[in-house]
From Swiss-Prot:
Protein name, as recorded: Der GTPase-activating protein YihI
Location of the region described as Disordered in the Swiss-Prot/TrEMBL record: 1-96, 145-170
Subunit and partners: Interacts with Der.
Species: Salmonella arizonae (strain ATCC BAA-731 / CDC346-86 / RSK2980)
GO biological process: one example: ribosome biogenesis
Ranges of compositional bias, category Basic and acidic residues: 20-30
Biased composition regions of type Basic residues, renumbered to the chain: 31-40
């Protein structure tokens, strides 16, 4: 009888054959040739990176940098565009004029009346009143004016001094 034939065994489990120098060089050339063709096509940066496919598609994809939708008049126009004027700084008033404005300020008068009536103002109004009163004091000092109350006190002191002198100098 015939002996059963065994299947041929693969040589994968055995010792692998070393590649020769020529085979290694050829594989390196193949890798280099494949590597050369990697990357973008030349001119892709200027073309927008999208390959043109189809003739009808070109009308839709126009370069947005070219042209403008707004019409530009080429002739001389009669209408002159008004230039925006920058806001001028506040006019500097003379100290006397500024003092007159502050003394006739309705808001300041109303808030001072509320204070005299015993009401308490919120912080914002109180700060505003204080600032305006300080400004009035500065302007009065610049102009050499003084409060009527101070003048009355000075007159009273002068009269008292006169009375002391008349009575005997004590």
């Amino acid at each position: 009888m015939k002996k059963p034939t065994s299947a041929p065994r693969s040589k994968a489990f055995g010792k692998q054959r070393r590649k020769t120098r020529e085979e290694l060089n050829q594989e390196a050339r193949d890798r280099k040739r494949l590597k050369k063709h990697r990357g973008h096509a030349p001119g892709s940066r200027a073309a927008g990176g999208k390959p043109a496919s189809g003739g009808g598609n070109q009308n839709q994809q126009k370069d947005p940098r070219i042209g403008s939708k707004t019409p530009i008049p080429l002739g001389v126009t009669e209408k002159v565009t008004q230039q925006h004027k920058p806001k001028s700084e506040k006019l500097m008033l003379s100290p006397q004029a500024e003092l007159d404005l502050l003394e006739t300020d309705e808001r300041l008068d109303a808030l001072l009346e509320r204070l005299e009536a015993g009401e308490t103002l919120n912080a914002e109004d109180q700060a505003w009143v204080d600032a305006k009163l300080d400004r009035i004091d500065e302007l009065m000092q610049k102009l050499g004016l003084s409060y009527d109350d101070e003048e009355d006190e000075e007159e009273d002191e002068k009269q008292e001094d006169m009375m002391r002198l008349l009575r005997g100098g004590n």
